[in-house]
């Protein structure tokens, strides 16, 4: 029948081709739209990432949050434009670095290094004081109008002696620690009492075997570790205080004597003649005295310079004494009663 022929698929090739073409076109159209949307999204994300990177670079390298650029609400620049991200005071890294930089160097510096630095400054000041006592190269310092106002010979001797002793101690400390004669025991485990002074000492590797000290005195292992008899550290009666403690105590005595000398006679080291430095200008000059010392005002200028230099010396001495007190207390477990300088 004709009805059967109409229902046969083989008799409808045109309808089948139409349906296939329609389905194919619909699928291609839908796929191209999805691809276009994905491409647009990809381009937007690339633009957003570029903007975030540029904002991070302009903010000084605060790129910690750039990885979170694709925000859910599309506002990817919110994190980059946040004032707190660009505020240096709220940046934890630089802030901690600044705090470290602002800490007083004296608190971070090793006490021994601080002590040696102050002693070097003190040596320079004392040398300047000695040079000031010798105007025009007069070794005896009698040049202020012949009035002996400075008492140069006596004062120079006191300062020169203190300077020499301080330089000796500075050399001991800089040469591997005080008590170098037995400092080797610190490494070999023999420096039980004064082990703190043994680091870097002369003959440290042979400390337990009795390594040679500074002047050749052998350290007899645990028995004589830290002995400073060979390091010129006990010539003032402090032989019983071995190692670093003895040297620090000797330095304390030297500084106390220096302070007393300066308090009694200043940098001149003696009592001025009647009339003081102002009257020295008209006094008859001694033989070999500097002619410039008789000019009006020269004695006043020298006195002003001496007072300024003396003030600087006293300031450094006070700082040295503070460090010495701390180091002596640490050496003796806080039981050491060290002598402090008298106030100016």
Curated annotation (Swiss-Prot):
Taxonomic superkingdom: Bacteria
Post-translational modification: PopA2 and PopA3 are produced from PopA1.
Outcome reported for the amino acid change (mutating residue 329 to E): In strain: OE1-1
Gene Ontology CC entries for this record: extracellular region
UniProt feature, compositional bias: Gly residues: 138-156, 268-279
Effect of residue 269 to A: In strain: 8107
Polar residues bias spans: 89-108, 295-311
Compartments it resides in: Secreted
Observed effect of gene inactivation: Remains fully pathogenic on sensitive plants, suggesting the bacteria produces other pathogenicity factors.
Region Disordered, residue ranges: 1-28, 58-108, 134-156, 211-242, 268-311
Effect on the protein upon substituting residue 305 to D: In strain: OE1-1
Composition-biased stretches (Low complexity): 8-28, 65-83, 215-235, 280-294
Keyword terms, alphabetized: Hypersensitive response elicitation, Plasmid, Secreted
Signal peptide range: none
One Gene Ontology term from the biological process aspect of the record: symbiont-mediated perturbation of host programmed cell death
Role: Acts as a specific hypersensitive response (HR) elicitor. Has activity on tobacco (non-host plant) and petunia but is without activity on tomato (host plant); PopA3 seems to be more active than a PopA1-PopA2 mixture.
Protein name: Protein PopA1
Record organism: Ralstonia nicotianae (strain ATCC BAA-1114 / GMI1000)
